[in-house]
Amino acid sequence: EWIVKACNKLQGQYTSGPCSVSQKAAEAAYTGTQEPVKEMQKAFERRRDLIVKLAKEVPGFEVNVPQGAFYLFPKCSYFFGKSNGERKIENSDDLAMYLLEDAHVACVGGTSFGAPECIRMSYATSDENIVEAIRRIKEALAKLK
């Protein structure tokens, strides 16, 4: 029994704290140049502005400018009750699945995020992928009547 307790204590010490390598990496991130961070911030602002502009052109979407992270939450309830002839869209989860299957674009229904009338779209990707994704989404949504 005492061996188990000793091993348990030892294991806790090994796994409960960050390793020295990650501590050094964190120190370098905090004390080093912030230029890469500024470049990433500009890139995400550009992508945000691009996806907002393009999503506002999607008939049926209501779009607000995101204030944090890298997700857009367009309101999509306009499409609830609509169908492509094969499946009926009842909620944002149905719409996200439809967009995955028909447009091959991954979105997430907003219910899990407290926004059941929205879908969550990430813009943590290239400008080209954003443009192509919105093109595919528009094409898929146009099939819903």
Model-derived features: where do they sit?
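PLP-dependent class I/II
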Residues: 1-145
